[in-house]
């Protein structure tokens, strides 16, 4: 049973640092919390669990034989075991437990050498060469201009990590006033290469059979540090940074006053409201109309005199405008002065300017105008593209612990693509690729994609946003560092990348835009089309239902079982209906990606269902790499991955079909 004592822990401290009001909502069963599983899924997708486990080998050559881990969830037993280990003059401990007043923390790693205690916070976050020179100068920046010129501030990217380790150091110092305390981060070192294949395979994830919410790592018996080769992690001392943070004021409190205030609020279950600012719009304590739970987000707005309901149009729906409007005291779209967005040009060479798109959204929202807008350039721009039209989508992963030898942390792995072609009235699911085996997939991925165009690239290739172009550039860099002996078709693969992509910043000068460089359909949407139905989002998950809402022709077409037939071929569907009476969004027509999977398997991956924009595929890929998976379960996951990726490229086809439909009406 979960302990009900209300200690201010590391995670609760982070919530209080984000917003004091959150301390009332967190762990409160009456309130919805969309982050309940997010931290686990993020750690799974990035390999965070494996980083935490392999980091133990930085403080012990044999952490399992040495029994350094405090595994119990029981507060009192964890404290007892920690204190017992600390009786030794020299010892390493993982998940060491400490309690001071109403604070309770578990230190990821701790080393005791006589009267010196070294504490380590382990994060699956990268550290690279540019960060190397002086960590303090990297973590603590200086304002160069403006009213604050010369003042120091904490690098926003590292803010919560650094406050976390400072919080831990404060408690350890209080408990051990006569000891020297050294505080450190352990991070994924992008300057190091792995020296073995399958480093991640040493540490598999399974569910704790005695706990519904705890996951545990399983590992080979007798594994030692020497078995792991080069460990791509780095220790970073942050004592100077912690000193700086402890001297900073937080909401007119000193550091010590603030953490004690948070502890008081949480212990006594007191809700202390704060003023609404732009951060509130990303609050996890929201609900949708179907939820029976309370919305902390709505209650905070109500406390500030603002009532939110399903019809409320909030400023965060206006593209790239949230902070600017909230700083003016505007929280609803009808409070915005649309004339503020008319001060710059309506158009640019691609179509709508950002200002005009924002203006359109504000005006349409105020007037309850549900009609979509099509820019006059639509006909000219769409008509210029050479036929046939190709649509590709990549699914990729980048993890802290590389799966393969001679790879850096967080190198991209391209494990899946889908490819549709639209040629006249004919739509075909032309190709796909999926590799979930524990091998480096990038070159076989690229070969397969190249073979899709074996007769040459005729027509126009479309992607949705920058991802596909970025990945091809990263594979280009990987290939440049290979020899033709190891990759015999290296030069052909490089030429193919240059043919269909544009160089990114790191490859500027390597080539000019390829003769068949992919066209970004996302940019066309942003510049040429606006639908109130998308609620300000340009994600393909919102644009697809928007164009279907706008097109009776497409609704009629895809309400029939024509997908996966002779009319429209498919590799993963048969006689499929994309739209039906209950669900007018193709993404909702598919069952949740892991619905069919037995929940008695190592991880309850039914929780993946809320992931989108590639998150589900990336997490599924990580699951297949990081867990013991039965063949029949693997096949089910792979089938679901293939269907979802196919839908992404079919979504692009439908969006483009709508553009073609519109230009024929002009």
Annotated model-derived regions:
Residues 1-666:
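DEDD superfamily 3′-5′ metal-dependent exonuclease/proofreading module
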